[in-house]
Amino acid sequence: MNNKNNGNSTKSICTILNRRINEIYDALDMGVSLEELNAVVISCIDEAKASGNDSADEAKRIFNSIVARGNYNHYLTTLVTYMTCINC
């Protein structure tokens, strides 16, 4: 299986995060916990994985490890990185 982002078959994490940006902003505006914000982000990553994106497992591991350390600022920096990473 070719796992590059070719058309509509495999979706990039970036594409899904940006499509669901309002959901993420709403969570941030409500001041949700890091775990609750992560649930929204992980659902986006799971959507990418379901489309065949091989980088989704690694992204999930990265976000979950940041949550385990409780570093909100690092989490937001990583989230912005993923939202601008066209090929991830």
Where are these regions (language model features)?
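Short terminal alpha-helical segments
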Residues: N2-M30
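Acidic, low-complexity, intrinsically disordered interaction modules
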Residues: L34, A39-R69, N73-T77
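Cysteine-centered motifs
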Residues: C85-C88
